[in-house]
Amino acid sequence: MQPIQIAIVALVVAIIIAIVVWSIVIIEYRKILRQRKIDRLIDRLIERAEDSGNESEGEISALAEMGVEMGHHAPWDVDDL
């Protein structure tokens, strides 16, 4: 192979690797943004529960839409034997 062909192949391989890496970065960034949104909703739920004594149904349904389950957070404290 001539040096120009090697350079072209190396450039194509580098572009493919860059696309894969940036795709992974974008996927992880979306996960982080989703987690921040979930954390904000949970914080608002906790704050409203402390203020009013009950939880907001709208925010619970928003969390349910994202697939987040509110419930038992201490797996070592289970009384369902």
Swiss-Prot record:
It comes from the Viruses. GO terms for biological process: receptor catabolic process; symbiont-mediated suppression of host innate immune response; symbiont-mediated suppression of host type I interferon-mediated signaling pathway; symbiont-mediated-mediated suppression of host tetherin activity; viral release from host cell. Residues 1-6 are extracellular. The chain crosses the membrane at residues 7-27. Phosphorylated by host CK2. This phosphorylation is necessary for interaction with human BTRC and degradation of CD4. Signal peptide: none annotated. GO terms for molecular function: CD4 receptor binding; monoatomic cation channel activity. It holds the Pfam family Vpu. Residues 28-81 are cytoplasmic. One of its GO terms (cellular component) is membrane. The modification Phosphoserine is found at S52, S56. Ion channel activity is inhibited by hexamethylene amiloride in vitro. Its main location: host cell. It is a single-pass type I membrane protein. It is found in: Host membrane. Keywords: AIDS, Apoptosis, Host membrane, Host-virus interaction, Inhibition of host innate immune response by virus, Inhibition of host tetherin by virus, Ion channel, Ion transport, Membrane, Phosphoprotein, Transmembrane, Transmembrane helix, Transport, Viral immunoevasion. HIV-1 lineages are divided in three main groups, M (for Major), O (for Outlier), and N (for New, or Non-M, Non-O). The vast majority of strains found worldwide belong to the group M. Group O seems to be endemic to and largely confined to Cameroon and neighboring countries in West Central Africa, where these viruses represent a small minority of HIV-1 strains. The group N is represented by a limited number of isolates from Cameroonian persons. The group M is further subdivided in 9 clades or subtypes (A to D, F to H, J and K). Belongs to the HIV-1 VPU protein family. Homopentamer. Interacts with host CD4 and BRTC; these interactions induce proteasomal degradation of CD4. Interacts with host BST2; this interaction leads to the degradation of host BST2. Interacts with host FBXW11. Interacts with host AP1M1; this interaction plays a role in the mistrafficking and subsequent degradation of host BST2. Interacts with host RANBP2; this interaction allows Vpu to down-regulate host BLM sumoylation. Enhances virion budding by targeting host CD4 and Tetherin/BST2 to proteasome degradation. Degradation of CD4 prevents any unwanted premature interactions between viral Env and its host receptor CD4 in the endoplasmic reticulum. Degradation of antiretroviral protein Tetherin/BST2 is important for virion budding, as BST2 tethers new viral particles to the host cell membrane. Mechanistically, Vpu bridges either CD4 or BST2 to BTRC, a substrate recognition subunit of the Skp1/Cullin/F-box protein E3 ubiquitin ligase, induces their ubiquitination and subsequent proteasomal degradation. The N-terminus and transmembrane domains are required for self-oligomerization and proper virion budding, whereas the cytoplasmic domain is required for CD4 degradation. The cytoplasmic domain is composed of 2 amphipathic alpha helix that form a U-shape. This is Protein Vpu. It comes from Human immunodeficiency virus type 1 group M subtype B (isolate LW123).
